């Protein structure tokens, strides 16, 4: 993506500031703006002292001491910004020329490369059952079969069970045989009820 910005509507500085670089007044005025005189490029102590002594104490501000070492700060600022009569400020100190006119037209290009790889595979399984069990009415409740239970007194003399499915008719109505047949009948009925329910 390329973005071009036209800054003609922004307040521009007249190119007359850049025309007289050699004079000390111009370099002093341009010290806080875009311009910077070439005489301050050499980062030696003599040039730094000359630069600081040429400014009044009222004009010396935080921008003149960007680091704890004033000489290092001066060297950084003087090498970072260089101008000539027809050039604007170049961040890489290249000699890009700009026409001398009262209206500046700068073009800024932004290069934006964005690569996004999204893997959005969503495996979802939703099972909705809309079958609702019907509430059993009281009549259905009454129609349920009541299976015989083997009570605690099932081995009494009154509890007589038919032994028609027995292998032989021996040992008729003994208490163990009664319990066995009652249990076997109960298991048959439970199995039949399960088959019907399924």
Curated annotation (Swiss-Prot):
Entry PTM: O-glycosylated. Hyperphosphorylated on serine residues, when in dimeric form. Phosphorylation by host CK1 is required for the hyperphosphorylation of NSP5 dimer.
Cited InterPro entries: Rotavirus_A/C_NSP5
A Pfam family that the UniProt record links to this protein: Rota_NS26
Molecular functions per Gene Ontology: ATP hydrolysis activity; magnesium ion binding; nucleotide binding; RNA binding
Subcellular location: Host cytoplasm
Biased composition (Low complexity): 16-30
Cofactor: Mg(2+)
Any GO BP annotation: viral genome replication
Keywords (A to Z) from UniProt: Glycoprotein, Host cytoplasm, Host-virus interaction, Magnesium, Metal-binding, Nucleotide-binding, Phosphoprotein, RNA-binding
Residues given in the record as Mg(2+) binding sites: 92
Segments for region (Disordered): 16-37, 53-72, 85-104
Family designation: Belongs to the rotavirus NSP5 family.
Task performed by this protein: Plays an essential role in the viral genome replication. Participates, together with NSP2, in the formation of viral factories (viroplasms), which are large inclusions in the host cytoplasm where replication intermediates are assembled and viral RNA replication takes place. Orchestrates the recruitment of viroplasmic proteins such as capsid proteins to these factories. Participates in the selective exclusion of host proteins from stress granules (SG) and P bodies (PB). Also participates in the sequestration of these remodeled organelles in viral factories.
Name of the protein this chain belongs to: Non-structural protein 5
Organismal lineage: Viruses, Riboviria, Orthornavirae, Duplornaviricota, Resentoviricetes
């Amino acid at each position: 993506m390329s973005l071009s910005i036209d800054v003609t509507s922004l307040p521009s500085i007249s190119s007359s500031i850049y025309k007289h670089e050699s004079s000390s007044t111009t370099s002093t005025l341009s010290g806080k703006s875009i311009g910077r005189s070439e005489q301050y490029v050499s980062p030696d102590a003599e040039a730094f002292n000359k630069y600081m002594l040429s400014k009044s104490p009222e004009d010396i501000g935080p921008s003149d001491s960007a680091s704890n070492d004033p000489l290092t700060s001066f060297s950084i600022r003087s090498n970072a910004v260089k101008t000539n009569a027809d050039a604007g400020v170049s961040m890489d100190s290249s000699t890009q020329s700009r026409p001398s006119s009262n209206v500046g037209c700068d073009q800024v290009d932004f290069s934006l490369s964005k690569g996004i790889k999204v893997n959005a595979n969503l495996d979802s399984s939703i099972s909705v059952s809309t079958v609702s069990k019907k509430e059993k009415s009281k009549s259905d409740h009454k129609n349920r079969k009541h299976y015989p239970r083997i009570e605690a007194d099932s081995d009494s003399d009154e509890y007589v069970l038919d032994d028609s499915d027995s292998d032989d008719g021996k040992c008729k109505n003994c208490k163990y045989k009664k319990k066995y047949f009652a249990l076997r009948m109960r298991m048959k009925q439970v199995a039949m009820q399960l088959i019907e329910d399924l």
